[in-house]
Regions:
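Aromatic-enriched hydrophobic runs in primary sequence
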Residues: 22, 26, 82-84, 92, ...
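Acidic-enriched, low-complexity/disordered segments with a strong bias for Aspartate over Glutamate
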Residues: 43, 51, 77-79, 85-87, ...
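Internal, well-folded beta-alpha domain core
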Residues: 98-158
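Context-gated lysine
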Residues: 42, 60, 69-75, 80-83, ...
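N-terminal ordered "arm"
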Residues: 2-73
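A broadly used, surface-exposed interaction patch
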Residues: 63-106
Length: 158
């Protein structure tokens, strides 16, 4: 089992409370990001890594000052906002900056692992094309590849 650590800096992430996610990228988004990273690896190396799961490790979470915006629930509310009516429904828009890592666990053969090691900097460049919905994603530093990290514990020591 191997681990790829992808440092991330996500800004303008919508962290308003909702029924689906409260303040953090959903588990589907994290899993999707890890899966997309493995697709990039497959496309660049020809290797076929087996996805063993992904996790988001948050190192720093900065909540930005919020602003009120009109709710998009009904046309009547939008008309009230345009007229300056104080009875218009408003909601708080909350944005944040999230710093941390996406930890991607995968299995792969020795030749595939060698291909990944050889192209790690090119893979890093390609990962900049991925994104979280509703925010701006950057990968501020180089990727870390941990070979033989059987239980994933080495990833969390970094």
């Amino acid at each position: 089992m191997n681990t790829l650590i992808i440092p991330i800096l996500a800004s303008n992430v919508n962290v308003g409370p909702s029924l689906h996610a409260v303040g953090l990228p959903s588990s589907n988004a994290i899993t999707g990001f890890g899966h997309a990273a493995l697709r990039v690896i497959k496309d660049m190396t020809g290797a076929n890594p087996s996805d063993q799961g992904s996790a988001l490790v948050i190192n720093k979470y900065t909540l930005l000052p919020g602003r009120q915006k009109p709710q998009k629930a009904s046309k009547g509310d939008m008309d009230k906002v345009k007229k300056g009516d104080l009875d218009a429904s408003l909601s708080d828009e909350r944005l944040a900056v999230i710093e941390g890592w996406v930890v991607v666990r995968f299995g792969i053969g020795l030749s595939g692992l060698t291909s990944i090691q050889d192209k790690l900097s090119e893979i890093w460049e390609q990962l900049h094309r991925l994104a979280f919905a509703g925010g701006v994603l950057s990968i501020p530093s180089k990727l870390i590849l941990l070979e033989g990290d059987e239980d994933g514990s080495e990833a969390f020591k970094k």
